[in-house]
Amino acid sequence: MSNKFINFEKISRESWKTLHQKAKALLTQEELKSITSLNDNISINDVIDIYLPLINLIQVYKIAQENLSFSKSLFLKKDIQLRPFIIGISGSVAVGKSTTSRLLQLLLSRTHPNSQVELVTTDGFLYPNQFLIEQGLLNRKGFPESYNMELLLDFLDSIKNGQTAFAPVYSHDIYDIIPNQKQSFNNPDFLIVEGINVFQNQQNNRLYMSDYFDFSIYIDADSSHIETWYIERFLSILKLAKRDPHNYYAQYAQLPRSEAIAFARNVWKTVNLENLEKFIEPTRNRAELILHKSADHKIDEIYLKK
């Protein structure tokens, strides 16, 4: 792995946790459980060892951003314009992006109690299923061409310029964009942007999404481990879908366990693994920080861009 990250400094978990003075986790076990995704695994010790030092590092980047903005305003002889601090979080399906994003949102809210900390997922910028069907792209859902990148870039541009912005809302229960529903963002102090595609931009050579980020994180793991987590999550989703006939996954909920596993493994290999290897993992080096997970979901190595 180290050969792939020649512009990164490798930091062990043991070394990383010393970069923050021991403190309380800033949240309870119940709160941590409520923000942990299906089949993810995170403990209070992980919060203290990994995420509190990360919050410190984000603060370093935020101060640097503010100092640069101030220096630019002096140079240009203009009033300083405070801009949202945008954090991009990427990685494979089922690697734990959502848990990390929600945890960072909560910790930033606790460490910056007077700041507005918002979270948006790029799922909302997928084209609606009907459009994907009309374009023959439904089986490419999640691949770069299934996202409305122009809309996503316009959203980020509005956010960065301090304007009110609106994002479509995606529901995993119906596997589609929710019609006529928007999430509004009114000049937040922090915005976390989470999605498999946050370092990609296949449709627009003008700029990348990452051009808008002040800090960025890639969640990394061996693909064989992610496959296991994906299958485990799929089985958990089916268990929940049995109670809701309107859930998209209810159609698979009655499958025998062996067939459900075979179905999930096929989806992983033909869709998610291909997407990971061709489009997601190659963008990994655009991140400022890479968090590597071992088979038990624990972060064992950290890579910080030099």
UniProtKB/Swiss-Prot annotation:
InterPro entries: P-loop_NTPase, PanK, PRK/URK. ATP binds at G91, S92, V93, A94, V95, G96, K97, S98. Keywords: ATP-binding, Coenzyme A biosynthesis, Cytoplasm, Kinase, Nucleotide-binding, Transferase. One of its GO terms (cellular component) is cytoplasm. It is found in: Cytoplasm. Its main location: cytoplasm. GO terms for biological process: coenzyme A biosynthetic process. Pathway: Cofactor biosynthesis; coenzyme A biosynthesis; CoA from (R)-pantothenate: step 1/5. Its EC number is 2.7.1.33. GO terms for molecular function: ATP binding; pantothenate kinase activity. CDD domains: PanK. It catalyses: (R)-pantothenate + ATP = (R)-4'-phosphopantothenate + ADP + H(+). Coiled coil: none annotated. PANTHER family: URIDINE KINASE. Belongs to the prokaryotic pantothenate kinase family. This is Pantothenate kinase.
